[in-house]
């Protein structure tokens, strides 16, 4: 009976780890999540990883494309910071030290480190085709940083590692050798599937937020649809996303179409340029991005 009580209490304690940390609110969506790592910790790790990556990466030698990445990135960053300051997230602005780099890599990819360190691969540009397409991608990557998805996932990983380790040890001691190993594997699978779902949710949330950020910066959010269609056509597969950490292209496009009416409420066209040039395509007066959190359509 004593062993059984220890077992039950320990299992409860292990799964309670998932609720540790401080509750924080994601800008724009209003979603709350629990974070157990500090901004200082995540920024330190991020800066180390970014410095290591850039030390070996080859920066693009295309001056026009590099200037475009920096121009679009800075415009998005300004719009995002303005929104954060006007909507109660002033404290988060200090975490960003924006950098925008274009590197020589044929992969169609981009990423944004916590703290605003952004890298775009040259292989992505044929898909973005213009500044607006690039803004859709950068808005998405910036959204990951603003929503603190890295800290959220790190929190989950810490809880998983601690929880499965404790559970396996206690079960081996209270029930018998070997049982704890099986239980740890089962618990790890539970956490893995849960984290997998949350990761896909993070991607969907970043799509939504990125769409809004692009609109705030004066880029037409409707161009997200043809961009993802191009990405879908260039993808080697478009299989079901049930075991993927990213939504399928089909699901992603459908979700973006559903959110488009909300994004258009933020959209006011501004000056844009053709790819690799300084030729203006449209100009209007910049507007405020002061908007309260909007409940997302289901």
Residue ranges of predicted features:
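N-terminal leader/targeting signatures
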Residues: 11-13
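A Zn2+-metalloprotease active-site environment signal
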Residues: 2-7, 20-298
């Amino acid at each position: 009976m004593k062993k059984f009580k220890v077992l039950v209490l320990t299992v409860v304690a292990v799964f309670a780890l998932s609720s540790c940390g401080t509750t924080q609110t994601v800008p724009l969506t209003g979603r709350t999540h629990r974070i157990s790592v500090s901004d200082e910790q995540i920024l330190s790790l991020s800066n180390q990883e970014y410095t290591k990556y850039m030390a070996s990466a080859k920066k693009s030698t295309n001056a026009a494309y590099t200037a475009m990445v920096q121009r679009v990135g800075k415009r998005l960053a300004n719009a995002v910071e303005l929104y954060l300051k006007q909507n109660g997230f002033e404290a988060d602005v200090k975490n960003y030290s924006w950098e925008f780099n274009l590197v020589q890599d044929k992969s169609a990819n981009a990423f944004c480190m916590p703290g605003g360190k952004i890298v775009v691969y040259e292989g992505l540009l044929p898909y973005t085709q213009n500044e607006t397409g690039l803004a859709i991608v950068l808005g998405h990557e910036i959204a990951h940083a603003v929503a603190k998805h890295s800290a959220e996932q790190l929190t989950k990983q810490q809880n998983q590692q601690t929880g499965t380790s404790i559970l396996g040890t206690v079960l081996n001691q209270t029930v018998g050798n070997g049982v704890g190993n099986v239980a740890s594997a089962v618990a790890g699978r539970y956490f893995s599937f849960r984290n997998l779902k949350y990761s896909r949710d993070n991607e969907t949330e970043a799509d939504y937020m990125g769409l809004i950020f692009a609109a705030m910066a004066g880029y037409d959010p409707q161009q997200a649809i043809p961009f993802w269609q191009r990405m879908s056509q260039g993808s080697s597969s478009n299989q079901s996303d049930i075991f993927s950490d990213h939504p399928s292209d089909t699901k992603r496009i459908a979700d973006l179409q559903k959110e488009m009416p909300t994004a258009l409420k933020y959209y006011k066209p501004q000056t844009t340029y053709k790819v690799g040039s300084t030729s203006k395509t449209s100009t209007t007066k910049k507007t405020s991005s002061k908007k309260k959190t909007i409940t997302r359509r289901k």
